[in-house]
């Protein structure tokens, strides 16, 4: 039996040879398929057949479950009567009937996927019936879907993905995520994640190879990022640093140059040594712009000879985007080239493949596409393979057509074959892509495209968004038509979205254009939430009042869809204001904020944030000026004036010129009515003025357009007849032209005109007004408020209410009298005054050209993702800013660890945060004076913060991001070298300490356990704990060290876990480290695994709570309030309390320290007079109040390590252990490890204290251990850890080949 995808046989199970019936025939997704040709020949109704099959299956299942139901009921009646809900209820019971109900649900799903084009309402009911159990259902049901696709060639997976997408679009829910949660691999497969990752790693490997063979320079891998001679202060690392950076590889790796190897850098590796595996990031792809539009930037034509011709387009969108796209040949443009898959012809082709009397040659493969032989633009198959709505077999046909294999000649020589291949469509497209940005066609089904473009986009969305409801096609009054066309719109948007995501890399910016593709952002974000997607609406956004009621089906998804873009650009403030207004009305849960300084609205809805900006589009000035300034154009303009106005025109004669598409939005009919009224009101202008109207005919196939155009043409003829006069026999009041003008002719008309007329009813921007004034600065301008350019000019002060007005405004194009008056004012305006006004307009347009427009939109600085510069006045401002930088740093760390290049807005955010802090500092210092809160009066003592460390950490992070994005695979060493300036002694001392530390880490090679303190060890002390955000570079280094050099890693700190604890200030992703807070008394392993020391009695915790409350009350007193923000402030840990009485910079006077110390001791004495439960311990920076352990001692980090070991069943008696600390509180941690494993401990101490060094040395020697290193600052420890990460590959290799020298 021939297998045909998607069609099932529903006959009852027939007895097998042994007399038993085969259950396979009754199982959904596993039934045999009937032959398509026999069904077509018999004329049977496929939909009815499949529906009857599904009906019988559900009836059989319901009867098996004991449900009474009318066996004559139709499939729709069964569904409407709650058939799916009943099946779902039985399935959820998880009893003996569940499997039967499950098979019934599969039958419904199978039917829905077979007819995904026309059973969307059934699928919605199906998903709703599953309720909160969709994940469980998909987990059990998707294997059946996959099995059918693999065994029978169906496309159920694609149908399921689209059906869920349509469901989410229409309902505003996120059910597609549930499918991804149930079957994680389906999303990766759909997006080609593994293929992308392979490409990135291959690219990285090529980079490494190219670096190793670079140009014969001794600099080799230590080349600076920037040439010092060219970039001056921009340098990050200079050439003179090469030798110093080279030292970081120490004695383990050296670089030598083979003079006979054409400049290749050879690595000489000593016995037992390691060679570097690369830097901290493993991809080097740079950001691209992926432009997505309905229309392509080119036109394709097939000549009669069979050769293809491709021409760059000249439309408005191409002019707008070309400057930014042409910068990088890796940029990509996705568009529909006008040839799509014809579903009916696909079926014919399908039958050809299955018929013995037909072969592929019997049906030309071009017939599958909506193209003709003489103009058949075809799309490469690479963008359609695996995409929904398209059979995979068709990919071979598409490629066959594109390569034009069917026209190759017999016995042609190689030269002829090369010429033929170059002139084939595939060759033409490849040639275009070699010399331009990449053009990638998007192929969809022809029937869908016709409905999407010629139907709902132009018949509903275009007039609706222009607020011209009278031009909405009447067919959309029918809910069924609206639904069908809306589904086609979603399907085409889905196809564009899939193509865009599959062709994108994580660092790319995807730019979607115009009203055809308003849902792509929502669909793309459901596939990959990390994408950065912008959308620009080139037309107005002014839907009529009934849009959200009469056309609710598409209105609400469009609103939600636009809010799923990262940022949305509008042409005018009018359009954005309307959108924000409608969001407030129809999406009341959305939160809208406005940044007046940046003029940006941010809308947060359903967990997504979207920035809304205004970007008036413009023109490429130089393209028009080049033509306008040529002698040929100037002469042509003079000839035009003479031809129209005569050789000797009247002095006051005026040529009015207007050019636009013949579209009802352009107000051509209203213009003609006003022009007739002009002569009626001002008969003295008869015989003088001429209106030259160019209305380029388009969309004649649409009834509303054809009727409108015919009416206007008739009106033009009537005007010429009505005002013809014998006094001026050669004068014609109106020239009406319906064909277009080439650019040179257009510019000549601009030069010839006296007054430009641009008066649309509603328009996005209308660039004609700008073209006119750029070419002819002395011309007058009649401009309607319907044009976006008029709004832009008004906001620029070019038409003030009181003052000099630079153009003649038409407020209401339907008011013929006022419209006529505007004509008259423009006609009689003195030439000098008119020229002055035109010059002002010209200057404004010249200063706001198209490059500024595209650059402004792409600028990451206006997105809500960016931290903007802000004024820091009080503590809340300061801490809020630092927490925002924590979020940014976490994203940086995560992206680097995943090998995803860093977006530019991260650097902008950190730079803006740094500048905000610098501007808030006292003049000439790095000290902040902040109010505790804005409510405090002026007499309240401000908080003082020395933020030198915070500013340094910002600088290091900014430096880190420059290195991490470099193409040099040795960016680790380069970054380490940049840290030397932060060493408290000298750069030489920094290098010596890093080398010594690196040698110890290399000797240990790999650690079974890594226990470390945080503050003072891995990070310098901050001005206060909430500000001690872990820098991004530190997070990356620590995570990579945990990944490559250690097995079990734990950060043990005296800080609390949460509520401004160690988890709040960390930027390392979960899974790399365990966190032991309160000296290891409470542990965070992962969100599902947290534990505490259970030995503390409840009454002791209550006692500690009383102490904490008393100290909190003390800090409310004005005399002591400033201790709230000194250092770590007041912190409640599990088992102890910390109150800072001095900061790291000794800025608190000694008498204040003594005063608060005494107050705290008084509180302790009052609550625990005998100190039976509490013990006070003072340090230089704080007072710690501990609950005594069962032994009566203070719980320390050594006990914290033992608690972890006991709970996690760790064996620290074997293997190697790395311990890092900086103070006496870390000594118990070291001692606990030495007691368990004396010879396996390696320890690093960040200290310059000789006393502490002696204590550590004596402790290690007591256990016979000599594996200790002392460093002066956290930067050295991090540098050594970073150096250790490049030892991922540890291989003992022989030296150079013996024959090397002879060679």
Swiss-Prot record:
Keywords: Glycosyltransferase, Transferase. Catalyzes the production of trehalose from glucose-6-phosphate and UDP-alpha-D-glucose in a 2 step process. It catalyses: D-glucose 6-phosphate + UDP-alpha-D-glucose = alpha,alpha-trehalose 6-phosphate + UDP + H(+). One of its GO terms (molecular function) is trehalose-phosphatase activity. In the N-terminal section; belongs to the glycosyltransferase 20 family. InterPro entries: Glyco_trans_20, HAD-like_sf, HAD_sf, T6PP_C, T6PP_helical. It comes from Aphelenchoides avenae. It comes from the Eukaryota. This is Alpha,alpha-trehalose-phosphate synthase [UDP-forming] 2. One of its GO terms (biological process) is trehalose biosynthetic process. The gene is tps-2. One of its GO terms (cellular component) is cytosol.
């Amino acid at each position: 039996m021939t297998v045909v995808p998607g069609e099932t046989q529903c006959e009852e199970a027939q007895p097998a040879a042994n007399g038993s019936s085969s259950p396979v025939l009754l199982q959904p997704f596993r039934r045999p398929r009937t032959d398509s040709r026999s069904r077509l020949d018999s004329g049977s109704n496929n939909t009815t057949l499949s529906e009857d099959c599904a009906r019988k299956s559900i009836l059989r299942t319901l009867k098996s479950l004991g449900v009474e139901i009318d066996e004559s009921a139709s499939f729709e009646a069964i569904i409407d009567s709650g058939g799916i809900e009943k099946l779902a209820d039985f399935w959820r019971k998880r009893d003996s009937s569940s499997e039967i109900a499950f098979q019934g649900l599969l039958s419904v799903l199978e039917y829905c996927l077979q007819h995904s084009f026309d059973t969307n309402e059934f699928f919605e009911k199906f998903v709703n019936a599953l309720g909160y159990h969709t994940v469980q259902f998909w987990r059990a049901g998707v294997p059946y879907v996959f099995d059918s696709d693999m065994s029978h060639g169906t496309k159920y997976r694609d149908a399921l993905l689209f059906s869920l997408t349509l469901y989410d679009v229409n309902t505003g829910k996120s059910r597609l995520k549930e499918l991804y949660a149930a079957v994680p691999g389906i999303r990766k497969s759909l997006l080609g994640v593994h293929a992308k990752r392979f490409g990135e790693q291959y690219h990285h490997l090529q980079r490494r190879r190219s670096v190793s063979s670079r140009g014969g320079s001794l600099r080799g891998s230590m080349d600076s990022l920037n040439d010092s001679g060219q970039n001056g202060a921009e340098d990050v690392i200079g050439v003179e640093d090469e030798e110093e950076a080279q030292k970081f590889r120490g004695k383990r790796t050296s670089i030598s140059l083979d003079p006979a190897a054409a400049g290749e850098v050879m690595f000489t590796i000593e016995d037992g040594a390691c060679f570097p595996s690369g830097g901290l990031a493993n991809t080097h792809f740079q950001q691209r712009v992926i432009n997505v539009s309905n229309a392509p930037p080119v036109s394709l034509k097939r000549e009669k000879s069979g050769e293809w011709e491709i021409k760059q387009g000249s439309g408005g969108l191409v002019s707008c985007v070309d400057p930014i796209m042409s910068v990088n040949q890796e940029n990509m443009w996705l568009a529909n080239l006008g040839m799509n898959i014809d579903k009916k012809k696909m079926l014919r082709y399908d039958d050809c493949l299955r018929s013995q009397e037909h072969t592929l040659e019997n049906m030309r493969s071009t017939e599958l596409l909506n193209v003709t032989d003489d103009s058949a633009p075809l799309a490469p198959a690479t963008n359609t393979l695996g995409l929904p709505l398209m059979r995979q077999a068709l990919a071979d046909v598409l490629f066959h057509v594109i390569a034009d294999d069917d026209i190759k000649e017999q016995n042609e020589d190689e030269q002829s074959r090369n010429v033929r291949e170059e002139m084939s469509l595939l060759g033409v497209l490849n040639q275009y892509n070699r010399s331009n940005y990449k053009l990638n066609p998007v192929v969809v089904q022809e029937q869908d495209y016709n409905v999407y473009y010629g139907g709902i986009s132009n018949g509903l969305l275009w007039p609706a968004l222009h607020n011209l409801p009278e031009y909405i096609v009447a067919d959309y009054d029918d809910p069924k038509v609206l639904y069908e066309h809306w589904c086609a719109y979603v399907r085409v948007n889905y196809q564009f979205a899939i193509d865009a995501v599959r062709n994108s890399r994580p660092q790319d910016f995807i730019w979607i254009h115009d009203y055809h593709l308003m849902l792509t952002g929502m669909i793309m974000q459901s596939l990959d939430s990390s994408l950065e997607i912008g959308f620009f609406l080139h037309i107005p956004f002014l839907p009529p009042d009934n849009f959200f009621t009469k056309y609710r089906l598409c209105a609400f998804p469009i609103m939600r869809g636009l809010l799923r873009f990262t940022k949305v650009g509008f042409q005018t403030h009018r359009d954005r204001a309307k959108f924000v207004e409608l969001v407030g009305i129809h999406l009341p849960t959305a939160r809208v904020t406005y940044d007046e300084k940046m003029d940006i609205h941010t809308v947060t809805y359903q967990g997504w944030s979207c920035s809304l900006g205004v970007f008036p589009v413009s023109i490429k000035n130089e393209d028009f000026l080049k033509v306008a300034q040529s002698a040929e154009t100037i002469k042509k303009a003079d000839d035009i004036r003479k031809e129209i106005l005569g050789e000797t025109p009247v002095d006051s004669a005026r040529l009015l010129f207007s050019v636009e598409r013949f579209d009802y939005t352009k107000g051509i009919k209203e213009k003609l009515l006003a022009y007739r009224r002009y002569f009626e009101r001002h008969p003295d202008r008869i015989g003088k003025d001429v209106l030259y109207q160019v209305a380029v005919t388009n969309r004649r196939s649409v009834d509303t357009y054809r009727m409108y155009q015919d009416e206007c043409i008739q009106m033009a003829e009537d005007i010429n007849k009505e005002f013809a006069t014998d006094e001026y026999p050669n004068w014609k009041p109106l020239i009406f032209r319906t064909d277009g003008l080439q650019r040179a002719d257009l510019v000549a008309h601009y030069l010839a005109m006296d007054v430009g007329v641009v008066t649309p009813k509603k328009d996005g921007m209308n660039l004609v007004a700008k073209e006119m004034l750029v070419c002819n600065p002395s011309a007058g301008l009649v401009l309607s408020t319907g044009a976006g350019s008029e709004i832009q000019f008004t906001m620029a002060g070019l038409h003030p209410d009181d003052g000099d007005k630079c153009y003649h405004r038409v407020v209401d194009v339907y008011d013929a009298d006022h419209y006529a008056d505007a004509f008259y004012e423009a006609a009689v305006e003195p030439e000098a005054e008119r020229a002055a006004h035109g010059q002002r307009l010209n200057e404004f347009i010249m200063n706001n050209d198209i490059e500024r427009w595209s650059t402004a939109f792409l600028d990451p600085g206006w997105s809500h993702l960016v931290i903007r510069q802000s004024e820091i006045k009080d503590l809340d401002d300061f801490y809020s800013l630092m927490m925002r930088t924590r979020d940014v740093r976490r994203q940086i760390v995560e992206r680097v660890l995943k090998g995803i290049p860093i977006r530019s807005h991260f650097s902008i955010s950190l730079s803006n945060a740094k500048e905000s802090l610098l501007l808030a500092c006292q003049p000439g210092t790095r000290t902040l004076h902040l109010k505790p809160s804005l409510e405090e009066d002026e007499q309240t003592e401000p908080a003082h913060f020395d933020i030198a460390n915070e500013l340094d950490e910002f600088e290091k992070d900014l430096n880190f991001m420059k290195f991490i994005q470099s193409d040099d695979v040795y960016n680790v060493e380069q970054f380490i070298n940049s840290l030397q300036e932060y060493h408290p002694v000298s750069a030489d001392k920094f290098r010596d300490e890093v080398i010594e530390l690196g040698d110890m880490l290399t000797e240990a090679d790999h650690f079974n356990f890594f226990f470390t303190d945080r503050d003072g060890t891995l990070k310098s002390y901050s001005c206060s704990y909430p500000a001690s955000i872990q820098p991004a570079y530190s997070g990356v280094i620590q995570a990579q060290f945990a990944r490559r050099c250690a097995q079990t890693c734990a950060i043990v700190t005296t800080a609390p876990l949460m509520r401004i604890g160690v988890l709040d200030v960390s930027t390392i992703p979960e899974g790399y480290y365990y966190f032991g807070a309160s000296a290891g008394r409470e542990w965070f392993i992962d969100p599902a695994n947290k534990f505490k020391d259970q030995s503390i009695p409840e009454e002791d915790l209550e006692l500690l709570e009383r102490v904490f409350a008393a100290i909190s009350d003390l800090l409310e007193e004005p005399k002591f309030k400033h201790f709230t923000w000194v250092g770590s402030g007041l912190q409640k840990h599990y088992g102890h309390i910390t109150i800072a009485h001095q900061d790291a910079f000794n800025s608190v006077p000694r008498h204040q320290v003594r005063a608060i110390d005494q107050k705290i001791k008084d509180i302790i004495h009052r609550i625990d007079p005998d100190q039976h439960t509490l013990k006070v311990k003072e340090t230089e920076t704080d007072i710690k109040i501990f609950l005594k352990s069962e032994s009566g001692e203070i719980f320390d980090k050594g006990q914290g390590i033992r608690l972890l070991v006991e709970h996690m069943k760790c064996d620290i008696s074997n293997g190697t252990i790395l311990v890092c600390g900086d103070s006496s509180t870390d000594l118990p941690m070291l001692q606990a490890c030495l007691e368990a494993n004396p010879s396996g401990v390696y320890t690093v101490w960040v200290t310059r204290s000789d006393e502490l060094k002696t204590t550590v040395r004596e402790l290690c020697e007591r256990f016979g251990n000599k594996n200790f290193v002392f460093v002066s600052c956290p930067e050295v420890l991090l540098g050594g850890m970073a150096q250790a990460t490049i030892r991922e590959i540890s291989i003992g290799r022989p030296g150079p080949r013996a024959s090397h020298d002879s060679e």
